[in-house]
Amino acid sequence: MGLKKFLEDIEHHFEPGGKHEKWFALYEAAATLFYTPGLVTKKSSHVRDSVDLKRIMIMVWFAVFPAMFWGMYNAGGQAIAALNHMYAGDQLAQIIAGNWHYWLTEMLGGTISADASWGSKMLLGATYFLPIYATVFLVGGFWEVLFCMVRKHEVNEGFFVTSILFALIVPPTLPLWQAALGITFGVVVAKEIFGGTGRNFLNPALAGRAFLFFAYPAQISGDVVWTAADGFSGATALSQWAQGGNSALVNTVTGAPITWLDAFIGNIPGSIGEVSTLALLIGAAMIVYMRIASWRIIAGVMIGMIVVSTLFNVIGSDTNAMFSMPWHWHLVLGGFAFGMFFMATDPVSASFTNKGKWWYGILIGAMCVMIRVVNPAYPEGMMLAILFANLFAPLFDHLVVEKNIKRRQARYGK
């Protein structure tokens, strides 16, 4: 008996009146994970499209894979380089034996030595990322299913995207219990309390990260959380620039200068999904081509960032090195590219109108640079900029609609 036939045979037990009626949401989630729902349109009007919500979410899920795989490779490579820089011989062996990520990597055929292969680096990075992703997926999925059972509606595939986005924007060293707590806040407080998918006004993944940032700042910011090496501390590129400008950008392990190309490719420490602008561009091209993400929002973010960063460059400052950061460095450092492509373009929390999307994107780009430059306590600004713009998105749409109504009334003399 095939899986599809099995699911069809037991479906009646989960339908209204069946003995497992209350578990319909769980059954439906499992069934639609593998197969397209068998629902058809029987009454007019018929609106047909080859891409439904499930396929949209799955395509976004696939679009972050380039950044995810590169991020795992980079996290493993950064950790191995740092470990071999600090330890050697028996001391390194003791460190490996005392950390389950390290010894699991070696048990699976990898190595932590300085000449580790790309496979070993990928494997070590996976031992950090995959447990976080699995924790986020299971805990967040539990809350999704629970609310669907209580409300008696289907499980939405949107959580596939929320879970992987959240896992990609946290440090690789984040404790698993904090990952569970963060996604709980994002799903329950930022989404389900307001009615679930389609009714939330904040991006759930960013809301969960913001909760962790303010509740547990030591585990999600600072200098010790970005490189997965025991005892290693190294400032991020944004923090280095804030301290001494472009000349202060150095690899914290080798001491070599960090070039723009290093940052663009992703050879720097950071969150798994945020380090490689190149990998993010590949994924962004997919979702823009399929019209899942709005090019207007992306262009607006770039315009806002370029204008404000150039303005700060012109003003200049003798005491704040961030004033000198040009727009092309803002693009490749921190979470700017990830936020612009995959967070700002969230179709639920972003503006709906075309003109509103432009203003929404411009606000994000401008606010991100302003937070980075003016706020000395917080070198990164994309997360707060997007959440701030989420609050204004309905206002932008309202103003656009009101202006359109007035223009049409004036046109027809009403």
Swiss-Prot record:
Its cofactor is FMN. The modification FMN phosphoryl threonine is found at residue 236. One of its GO terms (cellular component) is plasma membrane. The keyword Transmembrane helix applies. GO terms for molecular function: FMN binding; oxidoreductase activity, acting on NAD(P)H, quinone or similar compound as acceptor. The chain crosses the membrane at residues 23-40, 56-76, 129-149, 164-184, 268-288, 297-317, 322-342, 358-378, 381-401. It is found in: Cell inner membrane. It is an enzyme of class 7 (translocase). InterPro entries: NqrB, NqrB/RnfD. Its main location: membrane. The keyword Nucleotide-binding does not apply. It catalyses: a ubiquinone + n Na(+)(in) + NADH + H(+) = a ubiquinol + n Na(+)(out) + NAD(+). Keywords: Cell inner membrane, Cell membrane, Flavoprotein, FMN, Ion transport, Membrane, NAD, Phosphoprotein, Sodium, Sodium transport, Translocase, Transmembrane, Transmembrane helix, Transport, Ubiquinone. Pfam families: NQR2_RnfD_RnfE. GO terms for biological process: respiratory electron transport chain; sodium ion transport; transmembrane transport. Its EC number is 7.2.1.1. It is a multi-pass membrane protein. NQR complex catalyzes the reduction of ubiquinone-1 to ubiquinol by two successive reactions, coupled with the transport of Na(+) ions from the cytoplasm to the periplasm. NqrA to NqrE are probably involved in the second step, the conversion of ubisemiquinone to ubiquinol. Belongs to the NqrB/RnfD family. NCBIfam families: nqrB, PRK05349.1. Composed of six subunits; NqrA, NqrB, NqrC, NqrD, NqrE and NqrF. This is Na(+)-translocating NADH-quinone reductase subunit B.
